[in-house]
Amino acid sequence: MVDVYNELGLNYDPNFEEQRNLIDVYLRIYFPKIRPEEFISILDFLNESASDAKKGIEKNKIRTVYDTIKNNLILENEPMRDIEITKKKYEKEYVKLFKENYVTQSFIRAYLLDRGKKIDLFRIFDNFILNENYPFIQYQPPDGTPRSRYNEKYLLENERKEIIMKWFENTPWGISFKVRVSDKSDYKYMAINLSDNGRIDYKIQWKEEDMQTVDDIDKTYSFVKDLIRKINRENERFGIKLKIPSDDQFKFAFINTIQKFELPDNFAINHNDLSEFSRYFFPYVALVIEPRKRQSKTKTTERDERSKFGTYLRYKRVSKYDNKTKIEHRIVFFMRNYEYNDQSLSNEISKEFNITEEQALEEINAVRERYPNIKKSRKVLKKLENIPKYKPPGIGVDIQGKTRNNYKMRIAGARDRAQLNRIITFMNILIYLYAETYLYKRPDRQRMKDLLQKLTKIARRRNKVDEIVNHETPIKSVKQMTNIDRKRLTSKTEDDQNQWTRDCQNSGEDKKRRPQQFLNVEELQKLGYVWNPKLGDINFGHYERKIMVDSNGRTDSNKKKSEVVLRAVMLPLDDSGNNYVYYTCGPEENGKHMYIGFLKSKNPYGEAKPCCFIKDQLYSKNNDKRNLFLKSIGLIQNDESEVNKIVGDQLYILQSSNKIQEGRFAFLPKYLDIFLNAMLNNERVIKNHYLVSTTTGYYFKYGTKQDEYRYLNAVGSVLDLSIEDLRNKLSSSLTKDKNQLLFTSLNNGDIRAQFGSMESYLTYINTNKYLEYPLLNDLICSPGVINKYGLNIIIFQRKIRIIRKSFEREKIREHYYIVCQNHENIEDLIDPDRETILIVKEGKNYYPIILVKKEDENTKEVSITKTFQYNSNPENIVSHIFKYYEVNCQQEFKLLIKEKSNSNLNAKETNKILISLGIKEYVPKYQMIDARFKCRYLITNAGYIIPVIPSGIVKNVNIISTVNNYLKDYTTTQKYLTDLSKLTKNKLKIKPIGVFYKDKRQKSYVISAIMTEGYDAVPIIERSMTSEYIKKEKLLTQGRPNDEDIDRDISRGKSSIVVDKRVYEVSKNKYETETYQLFRYHLSYFLNNTTEGGKFKKEIENIINSEDINKRERKLELKNVLYRMTNADLSKTFNQLISRLNKQFGGQDNVSDQSENQSENQSLESETSPIVRELNPLTQANSPISIIQEPDTIQIIPEDFVPGRRNNLRESFVNTDVDEFDYSEQINPLDEPFDYATNKEPMAESVPFPKNEKTWLSIMPDSKIIDYPSYILKNNREYCYINKNKDACNINKHCAWNNSKNLCLFNVKRIQLIDFINQVTEELIQNELRASEILRRGEYFVSNIVDYNVFTERPGERIVMASNSNLEKILSELFGKENIPRIGKKRYKFDNTQTYEQLNFDNPLKETSIWYIQNIIDNNNTVFRAFANTYYWLVHPYDEVSMRNIGYYSPLQTTLSNIYKSQVINWLLQQENQDMIQKISSYIRYNKVEDFVTKLSMDVNTISSGIVELCILSILYETIIYVNDEYFNVIYVLHPTQGIVYDYKKSKNKFTNEKYQSYKKVIDIRFRYSSNSNYPDYIDALYPKKNN
């Protein structure tokens, strides 16, 4: 603490201005409690010439402070003396009262590095190899995007994934290791965190029953030490060795303990007395008062005199406890930064410091009085609701327990063992003195009590006694409860399932069903719960209490009472075995509903939900309720064999809802009921919700189990199969599929492409908990899997659309549409042999639709039909659905996007047509599939290749992977294609119309395929074809790559890459770029870590810092030093050249730069011409190093020697992207702890490079050939020096073994070294950052990592980055779509959906008497977006308005606009459209079509009048487009065949549409101009109401 007297000094006499400055600045910063008037008194006191009267004010204050301190010491000395005397004399007596102290929680840390050092956590994360003891590691870098690496096998085989989800969600800074600490449980893990400063932290938790003492904490150190050894072992080759801390170097952040004790002679604690007694020892503890828990005023029996709860203290003898000062500082903090009023501020202060609100108001007023002018820290203050957490001072010490057998002392927050022991000793003495004083009532202790009581009263008046009010309330709010037990009480809000808050809700004053929630046993014991090892006759330990209640559940009435036993249920919060939650019910809170039990409904995790009931479920006569209770507390296992159990009366028809009990009937939703019943004239008679009769039959929803396997449960209920039966049938069918025809056909090949192998798909079916419709439906429906002829499953899916309009309430509309699972299998629906299942999907629930018949009103017998078959009867349900199903299966893409290939057929359709011909040679024999397992060609018996669109395979045709064996010549192929087109009456669009060429020459083409009228390619034997012949035959030509060859090369991987010029140049560029970086890396090591290098470093720094020589001379001197330290021959040559040049131009200041440069080049011609001949001139344009080349010479001195030709080599450096990394098992990269304080790289000490060695690199001949294409760039840069033998050294292309020195050196060509030295010289002189890296100044160093976003991949491991665009897909494969964990609580995810909704809400659909008007986002491909909106409206005539309009801005609109734009660009580039282009070119600026295409392809802004784009779209989509002005007058008309038929600028007459009224495809767009520009400022989509 700075002393103000010493700071100012004797006789300090400032003037008025200096005084004001001191008061405003100095005192406010260092002595804020000194008032301005007090400062004047201090100055008088320091002035020796001041009068005694002036000095007296400060002297009196000093005397007062001294007396206060002296009296405080006297007050504190007495209780401390009593404690110390008792400690010395009665140790045996007070120690025997207490049992062993057990640890419940502890947070421990240790430091692995010296102060000032850093760890590169990237290295540790990248090198860490996972195994069963370390299955998961997470790295949170400073950029805030967590990277998780996990053992894939472990997670896939682990069925209980809730704990794994938490691993992903919790993202601490640094690296977090999950370490297995128990062999008894697969889920017993400890999280160990490592930060970049070398601090390692971990937390351990135990239960009291584990009986772990402080000494047992030492045993956990071994897990940390083993982890450090593993890190060091994986980096041993590089000498990376983190310190393994000794046991005494592990420090506690906090320790929580629990200790039992017993009072002698059957005495019991009166907590009121103990609380009062603890006040007397105010130097040690402060009392925490809990008003809610204090004793009531009315006392009846002796038992009632004992407090029902405990004594709560805060241990004060800790550093910085000063509670009074902290309160003051906290109030000032709030006043400066937050909006507040006195009530809210006092409420917050009372909570944080555990004082009453009255005391808090007093403190606030005192602060105002002391600091009347507190300035606000900002203009806009924060809200008081969003304040940071505040930890109360002191260490919590709680004495709890109602009965003498359950007294416990809990200590929370001790900082170390010594402090813990001091607290335990004091509390032991306090309890001993309490017993002596209040229980035994010893006379000498009574005198001590009286004295302490008097001193305490004095101390209280002097504010030395803290009385703390505990405002911590028990967990009661729903939000708090659900936050603690998310597994049971919360689930993602779905329409299909009620939340726990609704299922177990309070209603009125007499129905309180929500239970109480507790997190520790002590809170239960306060309520009187005791441990009982048996539950009835079952050995099952639990807590229970006995109370007397009347028939209304009241304990305080005069009615007859009976004893009841109330139990608490203990449920695990996770699978760690450490964390539990307790639920209880009682008459005090719940009235009659005093028994804890469980609801029948479960949440998505399958966990039963606790609730309070009037009757005890354990003794219920209903076996189902009793078994539910026993299952939920873990006494009996779930019976998975229960299938489709019917609950309740089936004939009671439930209303349409999202939740239907198993086996019950419910009405279909309104529109489905109309579609399936009213439209088929089905009738039913219902009375009081009971089904009386239905002679026609009536379709209802059928309830099934929906807590897990929802889709399979729905299907199984129809087929009377259990989940296990279904799984076995699915697995069996795949196992028998030897040729993988079935597997390849599923979802048209998408299943095989997604899972890769059948084994992965089988694993998914047999182990995944979330088996849903998209991935299973095709397999279930396939013939021979479940049913001999196959199944059809039709799903009616609900879609909710929220309609929002300005100034109106939002409307919610439900729509049901038929899901089209596979548009290629539409005809399967009308196969009379197939059985059809109807299912309605609402939210995530699947419910079968069944037909119920009941002809006799007097009986309960009903006929239920669960599956249906097709026939041509119009009243047949399948026939009724089919026409709608067929329409719904029309591909949206084909409706909205016009392409020439849209008329082509898939493999199944083509196969059907070929078989129908009845000609054997045209019957398909094989089918060729591509890399995505889509069928591309059918090969007939005659070997004819028939193209099909990429589609699902034909199940009974064998698969091949290439058509090369069936290629025919051009003439033969053309003939059979023409013949087959005629035979099929042009159903197959395979008539030849052109050719695809592989290569184009001057007068000919190399033809590789024939182009059909469907623009498909039919491969042929390659041949040359002249341009003249192609023109004569009127054939279209198009260059097209061979997709089959591309797919084949991709599947082969890197081994199939053909090394051409491009591959060679890219590989060479990559090699040379990395060679230069490695040169800098080794140069930096030599300069900073060797004796000889250190000498050169001093020379370099002297040259750089010299101000006596100019920049050109500094560069020459630097080059001289660099050549001397690298190669003697080059150094000699360099000096000779400098000498010759100086002689040649010596004294001639005006010699031209050009003549000097020419002279230099001529002097080097004879020495360097062999080098030049070996250089590949093709590499110079892309070379990352600037090799300066002339026809016959190469410069050893760069051109900047001549000032007129200075060239910054750094600017010519090409920093190419890393194209290829070595992802295989690499040499473990270097973990680089970096000592920023000493400029020394710790790992460098272990590099086996002699300190006095002068040779640090070797030079290879320039003629040496390097295999560039085989070069693999490693992400981890390594010193060549670490290779200890010749074999290891020569593996690296950048290293060479020196036999004479027995050392591995960095290897470089002479020509490269010259340029490297030139470039390093530039960096040292002109680039301070790069120079600092080489010279290792401060925190700078040459990076030994190429890319920090690239990690080493290992078999069986997977890396997930939070920034990955496929993050949700990856996590859904692990946890299911319903349970995707929130990485970092979704801190890094941007929700686009909300943005789209907000944009559309702000720009709603408007309407006039004849138009609906939708404005379109401007300057964002607006013309194409407007066309997308209007065309979408046009092709969806039967949808309602809200569904037809795709809005102001949406993802679908973006996709369509991009496609339309690409089609327009493509149309403009096609030669056959030149005639039309000429007609519309006047609407293109300067008639420059090429410039227009370029600008259109690169810009999203509105860059034209929009007429050209719309005209082309009109042609492509055969649509008339009317362009209207702001007043709905037609200003342009665009016709699909005639082009621009009306332009208001060129026509004097107003447009009339009589001529085009019969045209059906018409769309309207409106242009609005806000200036004189020819380009529209705003564009709207117009929808006519007449067609609605």
Swiss-Prot record:
Higher taxonomy: Viruses, Varidnaviria, Bamfordvirae, Nucleocytoviricota, Megaviricetes
Polar residues bias (residue ranges): 498-507
Residue ranges of the region described as Disordered: 486-515, 1146-1176
Cellular compartment(s): Virion
Protein name as catalogued: Uncharacterized protein R327
Bias (Low complexity): 1150-1169
Top-rank lineage group of the source organism: Viruses
Keywords: Virion
Residue spans of biased composition, Basic and acidic residues class: 486-495
Gene Ontology CC: one annotated term: virion component
